[in-house]
């Protein structure tokens, strides 16, 4: 955090996201995997951007359902970081043979509830299993998938809900 401030690569957060960010840091002291659930429009992209900025020297994989959301996160970061790889969920399927080559210290998943879909979920699970020491953070406004009422926090994140704002 201090290093990101001094380098000028700091992402300011509103108080509710600052509280979420502190909860993430506390959560990662006990667990390597967890989630933040916040309502639509509350700034989850900025929360991820802050995490990226604060870990800019480490390898980070960022997954989101589409290019628009990935671009939103990139814009919120505000600067280019060579150690960050941005991928859509579809790329997990399209480039599945490459998933074993993806290496990360941190895996960030925006709109993680989409991984309740079996094909994406299994591809994501491969990436997580191939990076057993990576910290994994998911964000979503809707963690429960309506078909079958699947709780994706329990299914993919060991039930670790670091912060919730609805």
Q: Which residue stretches match the model-derived regions?
A:
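Walker A/P-loop
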Residues: 30-51
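Conserved pre-motif I regulatory segment
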Residues: 1-35
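Hydrophobic residues on the short alpha-helix immediately C-terminal to a glycine-rich phosphate/catalytic loop
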Residues: 24, 47-55, 123
């Amino acid at each position: 955090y201090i290093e990101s401030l001094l380098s000028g690569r700091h992402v300011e957060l509103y108080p509710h996201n600052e509280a979420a960010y502190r909860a993430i840091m506390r959560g990662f002291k006990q667990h390597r995997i967890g989630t933040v659930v916040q309502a639509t429009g509350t700034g989850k992209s900025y929360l991820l951007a802050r995490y990226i900025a604060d870990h800019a020297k480490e390898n980070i994989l960022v997954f989101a359902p589409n290019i628009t959301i990935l671009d939103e996160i990139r814009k919120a970061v505000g600067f280019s970081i060579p150690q960050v790889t941005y991928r859509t969920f579809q790329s997990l399927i399209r480039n599945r043979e490459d998933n074993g080559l993806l290496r990360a210290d941190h895996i960030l998943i925006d709109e993680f509830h989409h991984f309740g879909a079996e094909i994406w979920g299994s591809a994501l699970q491969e990436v997580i299993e191939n990076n057993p020491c990576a910290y994994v953070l998911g964000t979503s406004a809707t963690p429960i998938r309506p078909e079958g009422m699947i709780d994706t926090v329990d299914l993919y994140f060991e039930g670790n809900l670091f912060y919730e704002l609805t």
